[in-house]
Amino acid sequence: DLHDYCIRHPSATYYLRASGDSMADGSLYNGDLLVVDSAEKPRHGDIVVASMQGEFTVKRLLLTPRLTLQPMNASWSPIYPDPDELDIFGVVTHIIHRPREMY
């Protein structure tokens, strides 16, 4: 069952619709459905939902050599957040992508 496959912590998991193209080279596209687990501890290399100064973003989290929110699109620049101003709202555990538009 898809629910059992995608959701490890039901009370801490939510869905989010991706918007934009900053992660397109990482196979995360505008309109994709993200499964986000707020109970998972973010690790180096995870794709996370983060907020800085009230602005939300989805990026790859790099912890070393410097805290970085790394886009996966060469047209976008990395973000080097102040750790005191960065809030991580969850780890993206699955990406649901339609290979074609459904009409």
Predicted feature residues:
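Acidic/glycine-rich C-terminal interaction modules and beta/coil loop segments
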Residues: L2-Y103
